[in-house]
């Protein structure tokens, strides 16, 4: 978490190997990121994604193209995508697209799942459902979430990395409230 401009997106780009650190090293699964070649262990759901440039088919076609057939069924049921399967991805709402992008990331059964603003574009019912899904999938994998939704973070995070303070800090649940007040100047 952190205010705009604190470096949240930059941190994600570093974790995903899109940027190289100017100083220090980043390790993923015990390997320095420049030597890391097991990207299938990482699932990523961007905040915004323009799939229409290369995909005009249905949600079902997209899922089957990306995933092995046996993996798709549980994901469709788990995310309640049944009513979206025959629809074109480009004609879905932003929230519906977000759910499909999460499904695509889960087809890899990643050890690390990185989500950039996963609640963007979701109505309250969809937010509650995605929050439940994230609780379930985080039981057997590491989930990194960038979010401006502080209530979501405080309800779900086991640790919070606070950017935009005098120094970057890892915070545990008992201190969340105090750090949020400091970070956003609330008293």
Please provide the spans of the model-predicted regions.
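Helix-to-loop junction immediately C-terminal to a conserved catalytic motif
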Residues: 16
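Conserved ABC transporter NBD signature motif
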Residues: 24-38
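Conserved ABC ATPase "signature" region
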Residues: 70-86
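Conserved ABC ATPase signature
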Residues: 88-92
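Hydrophobic anchor residue at the start of the ABC signature
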Residues: 102-103
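Catalytic Walker B motif of ABC-type/P-loop ATPase nucleotide-binding domains
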Residues: 113-117
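Conserved beta-strand-loop-alpha-helix hinge in the C-terminal portion
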Residues: 163-187
